[in-house]
Amino acid sequence: VIFALVLGNASPVQSVAITATAVATAIGAASQIISAGTSLASTILSGLAASGYRVTCAIQVENWTRYPLIYATVQINRNAAVTVSPSSILPGKREGFSVRMPNGLAEGVYGTVSWELLGIKRRFVLMWSAPFNFNHFSNWMGVGLTRPGITKVPSGMTWFNKMYYDKTGRVGNLHFERGEFYYETNPVIYRDSKFEIEGTMTNIHNA
């Protein structure tokens, strides 16, 4: 399971580390403000995941900004499947979607999902990798934003390859932070002068 929070008006000079406990506290407080959107109105996040598959991934995003997140775009590995499609996320709402491994193949599921911030001309991008074999691979997740004015989604797995393989996340049109979720599940946090994105991922196959 992946949880991501998109917040507005964060300050890059706030250098105090945000711990998993602090994030949990913030999520608890936000539960009084953030409400379920259409996709989660009648189910919990884990209820979106496909049953009968070794590797699935259910993703929830909470929009703490005043900007609607629109034009959701998913790009995943070949033969994997989107079992519940992502939707637009209004301010003050949380929405979820799910993906699964390819049918009949010993492969995991990986890719990116992104939304445009209405009126800002930027895209919020979330990358995940949920492997089939934990002997050689781990769960990974990354979160970031495109530079102002960049809303076009590149073809194929361009953003996934950048967020999974690049050693630095502060060059080019997409800036991001990423983390490995194996021994620990501490949150990944991306900040710039306007926004802050926090995300965490479980370290199991049904992520």
Swiss-Prot record:
This is Tereporin-Ts1. Phosphocholine binds at residues 111, 129, 131, 164-165. Residues 1-11 form the signal peptide. Coiled coil: none annotated. It comes from the Eukaryota. Residues 35-54 are annotated as: N-terminal region. Octamer or nonamer in membranes. Monomer in the soluble state. One of its GO terms (biological process) is killing of cells of another organism. The lineage of its organism: Eukaryota, Metazoa, Spiralia, Lophotrochozoa, Mollusca. Expressed by the venom duct. It comes from Terebra subulata (Chocolate spotted auger). InterPro entries: Actinoporin_PFT, Cytolysin/lectin.
